[in-house]
Amino acid sequence: RYARVTGVQTCALPILLTEIAREIRVGIIDAVHSAKSGHPGGSLSIADVLTYLYFEEMNIDPKNPKKPDRDRLVLSKGHCAPGLYSALAHRGYFPVEDLKTFRHTDSYLQGHPDMKHTPGVEMTSGSLGQGASTSCGMALANKIDKTSVRIYTILGDGETEEGQVWEAAMFAAHYHLSNLCWLIDFNGLQIDGPIAEVMNPTPYDTKFAAFGWNVIECSAHDFDSIEAAYKAARECTDKPSVIISHSIKGKGVSFMENNVAWHGAAPNDEQYEIAMHDLGER
């Protein structure tokens, strides 16, 4: 529905991106409500980041989704597929109305991303930690081939409790994968509660710095902050970058914000109407 927004006057860019992000959030709620299942909380918390990546940052073409020089996004926190699908739909990879087939039998929009069935999905994901490793492999291959391709990865903060993430972090620094940029969706909540209580993976800044990464922080719901973070990542040419993205789980829907109950639950009809009102659709 939207083309890439590059070329929009700088003063108008955050306004346009904010509207796109709002529509992406509407798509997320439509998807999980239709399926009566799914993961809205963490999908809503990355909606602004997904908006910036797909509509401003990444070199992609929905009309030619397999072009060799395209940038790649790996959604390592694959349970947040509703966010990815809504971003892809609004970017033009498939019809927005198909979001309401999410998790339905025979739909190409299943509960976790599948690179063999869904246009625009670069890596099948859902087993937490694996996207961290596969994105490293993508980055190394493109470094060997001397391409201009950049690899973007989104991980959950709870996901960083997986040991595989830290093995991948060591690998990326060892091979100086400056074409790799991870973003950690730091909303502080996972399915069992606050990450600090379940298995505290912080502090991220000193840990990643010790591993040899370029560490950046941003506000996940401020497009100026997101833009500055990805610009800083691009300017780093000798090591991988990680963005610690401070977010609000369930952002945009009043009763879902900072509420762990909405990690993996769908709104009923009454709650759906409240969510649509919160998102400006009523």
Where are these regions (language model features)?
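Single conserved hydrophobic/aromatic residue that forms the stacking wall/gate
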Residues: R1-C11
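N-terminal hydrophobic or amphipathic helices/low-complexity stretches enriched
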Residues: A12-I24
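N-terminal capping segment at the start of a domain
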Residues: A21-S37, D185-N187
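Cofactor-binding active-site loop characterized by glycine-rich and histidine/acidic residues
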Residues: I28-A31, S43-H174
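Glycine-rich beta-alpha junction loops
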Residues: H79-C80, L84, N187-G188, D222, ...
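Thiamine diphosphate
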Residues: G120, T124-E235
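Glycine/aspartate-rich loop-and-adjacent alpha/beta segment that forms the canonical ThDP
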Residues: F223-R282
